């Protein structure tokens, strides 16, 4: 069967001529003779096109058209940093990952790019890439897949009910800021800030300013003026968008080219540490579900488990489900 290749940016997908001619009401022979630059190219079926295989996944998704979208380029070790950055900008998702070799024993080497910069760690790229390596590409059949990121080695465990868990690094608790100052600088109404808990910088590999709010309604109406005070801001409140969620959150990171992130595993790891550190639920051990992304029509659910022992050591785990969305060829 004759095929044509439709060209969108630098992404290829094949479309049967018979299907196109039927939809457009054009004779297939006439359609095959079209040569519209930048739109249709008549390429024989089976021709080897140089490029990179890529996959799209939705991470922290409980269903279709949900979660945080991730693009992953396979076999990317021969790409330069500049090429990776251009590809990440072209996809324009919150993050794009590049698998650059490795193995199941020592771990797989992965680089993470936002549309604006490379970052050492991020949550949903970690889970999405581990899912592809084990479930789709079959590079590993182990229950735990290890990723070698710029921030260090991150193990991802494939748990029950199709939930993937990543263990995050020990948290670093930074400066606490006055609530009035935070409200003035970020344009948040002081009445919406929960003054029982601090506004504090926290990092488990990527730093966020954690801002507690008084209610889900306050979280829904908040409008943040992100600036140099906190280029990555994470706001949270008790109460969920769904009945099975105990908390809700929103994340803004203009520094990395992200206006609002649908689901942020790294920030939720910081939240898990914060909740345990400040005994938010009256305990140094937490097990909660967090809703995020509802304000940007990408409903997401993250599973948080964390504890702090008597020596001050934390065990922080963030989980979620992953859905495979699409695959294709990226022409370089």
For each of these PLM feature ranges, what is it?
Residues 11-13, 39:
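Cysteine-centered motifs
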């Amino acid at each position: 069967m004759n095929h044509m290749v439709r060209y969108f940016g630098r992404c290829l997908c094949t479309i049967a001529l018979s299907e196109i001619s039927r939809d457009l009401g054009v004779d297939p022979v006439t359609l095959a003779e079209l040569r519209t630059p930048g739109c249709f190219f008549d390429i024989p079926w089976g021709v080897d096109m140089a490029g990179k295989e890529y996959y799209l996944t939705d991470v922290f998704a409980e269903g279709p058209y949900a979660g945080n979208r991730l693009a992953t380029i396979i076999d990317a070790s021969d790409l330069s940093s500049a090429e990776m950055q251009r590809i990440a900008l072209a996809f324009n998702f919150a993050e794009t990952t590049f698998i650059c070799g490795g193995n199941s024993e020592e771990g797989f080497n992965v680089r993470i790019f936002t549309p604006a910069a490379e970052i050492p760690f991020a949550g949903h790229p970690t889970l999405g890439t581990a899912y592809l390596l084990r479930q789709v590409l079959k590079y590993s059949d182990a229950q735990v897949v290890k990723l070698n990121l710029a921030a260090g080695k991150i193990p991802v465990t494939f748990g029950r009910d199709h939930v993937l868990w990543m263990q995050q690094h020990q948290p670093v608790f930074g400066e606490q800021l006055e609530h009035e100052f935070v409200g003035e600088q970020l344009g948040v109404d002081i009445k919406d800030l929960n003054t029982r808990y601090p506004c504090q910088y926290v990092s488990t590999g990527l730093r966020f300013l954690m801002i507690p709010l008084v209610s889900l309604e306050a979280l829904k109406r908040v409008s943040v003026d992100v600036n140099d005070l906190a280029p990555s801001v994470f706001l949270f409140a008790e109460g969920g968008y769904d009945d099975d969620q105990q908390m809700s959150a929103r994340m803004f990171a203009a520094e990395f080219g992200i206006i609002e992130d649908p689901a942020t595993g790294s920030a939720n790891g910081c939240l898990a540490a914060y909740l345990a550190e400040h005994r938010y639920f009256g305990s140094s051990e937490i097990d909660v579900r967090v809703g995020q992304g509802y304000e940007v029509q990408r409903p997401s659910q993250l599973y948080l488990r964390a504890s702090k022992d008597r020596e001050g050591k934390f065990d922080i785990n963030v989980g979620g489900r992953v859905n495979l969305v699409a695959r294709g060829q990226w022409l370089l």
